[in-house]
């Protein structure tokens, strides 16, 4: 629930919010949405016919909800037991924002596929899918893209990755995120329901609509 994975046909099918889906149906059949951080619901939803479980380790569009370690580790176990792939969507969380290069590293879990984009090339449009050894049938030439491997985007990505490593942007995000949360908690406002997040990906949930605060 609350998942947002994109606006193209496949990713939109896995996106929960109806406002994005309306006008584009029918979408891909066989997609089920499961309550986030609910291991029991995930156990019931995944079976031997399930191709993959796709999730965000921190739901961004859904309200900055981090997954529990138990949930992510259970997802890995369930996928292994039932022959499904574990796909982690790191479009928003990847490349240091949460205090590690990839948010899934906080959970000591290795996904089968990891999607990344946005900050990958420092704002220049670029996306990538990282695959592990369980994805055996995806070989060079199986998938193609008109704009794939764009030289400008690749050069921008190389430069951005150099800066991330040389300036330790993940470490900076961890330190600054901890500082931000510490200061936010000191506000102690009766209007704040919850402060949550991971690294520098932090959300403040208010008890009323936020229109009046922005």
Model-identified regions with their sequence ranges:
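Conserved N-terminal phosphate-binding loop of PLP-dependent enzymes in the Aspartate aminotransferase
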Residues: 1-214
